From Swiss-Prot:
Presence of the UniProt keyword RNA-binding in the record: yes
Record-level GO cellular component terms: cytosolic small ribosomal subunit; plasma membrane
One Pfam family cited in the UniProt record for this chain: Ribosomal_S17
Domain of life: Eukaryota
Keyword presence, Transport: no
Source organism of the structure: Arabidopsis thaliana
Family annotation (PANTHER family): 40S RIBOSOMAL PROTEIN S11 FAMILY MEMBER, SMALL RIBOSOMAL SUBUNIT PROTEIN US17X-RELATED
MF terms (GO), sorted A to Z: mRNA binding; rRNA binding; structural constituent of ribosome
Entry-linked InterPro entries: NA-bd_OB-fold, Ribosomal_uS17, Ribosomal_uS17_arc/euk, Ribosomal_uS17_CS, Ribosomal_uS17_N
Organism taxonomic ancestry: Eukaryota, Viridiplantae, Streptophyta, Embryophyta, Tracheophyta
Annotated protein name in UniProt: Small ribosomal subunit protein uS17y
Length: 159
């Protein structure tokens, strides 16, 4: 079962837990009762979402949230909140008077499911969903760790 740390009993709404059958339905996750879905748009459902035991209503893979609208990517700027990160998007803005570009950025708060391990500096892909709180309107769909980025400078291979 999931870690019950809240006062209310945490469970997935589409899974019946009081089955009289023995064996298979005892624990969620691998071989047990667990609701998960394919969100489409070319994103694979993480293995942790299928086999894990976490309960998260705002998760796009195991919760009741659908992804629609914009798909954005950026860098994780802050991961200090619980299940929420700040995604920084850098862009260039053209100044007509000087005929040059200036650097600008925007910070977007996004909900991160427990099936992802996100640290500062990781590249993340986020998708728009319904408002999850006062400021959060996006959900993390994919994480690329900071060290394994295929985009960037290649190391010198030698002679």
């Amino acid at each position: 079962m999931a870690e019950q740390t809240e006062k209310a009993f945490l469970k997935q709404p589409k899974v019946f837990l009081s089955s009289k059958k023995s064996g298979k339905g005892k624990r969620p996750g691998k071989g047990g009762n667990r609701f998960w879905k394919n969100i489409g748009l070319g994103f694979k459902t993480p293995r942790e979402a299928i086999e894990g035991t976490y309960i998260d209503q705002k998760c796009p893979f195991t919760g009741t949230v659908s992804i629609r609208g914009r798909i954005l990517s950026g860098t994780c700027h802050s991961a200090k909140m619980q299940r929420t990160i700040i995604v920084r998007r850098d862009y260039l803005h053209f100044v007509k008077k000087y005929r040059r570009y200036e650097k600008r950025h925007s910070n977007i708060p996004a909900h991160v499911s427990p099936c992802f391990r996100v640290k500062e500096g990781d590249r993340v892909t986020i998708g728009q969903c319904r408002p999850l709180s006062k400021t959060v309107r996006f959900n993390v769909l994919k994480v690329i760790p900071a060290g394994s980025s295929s985009i960037g400078k290649k190391a010198f291979t030698g002679m």
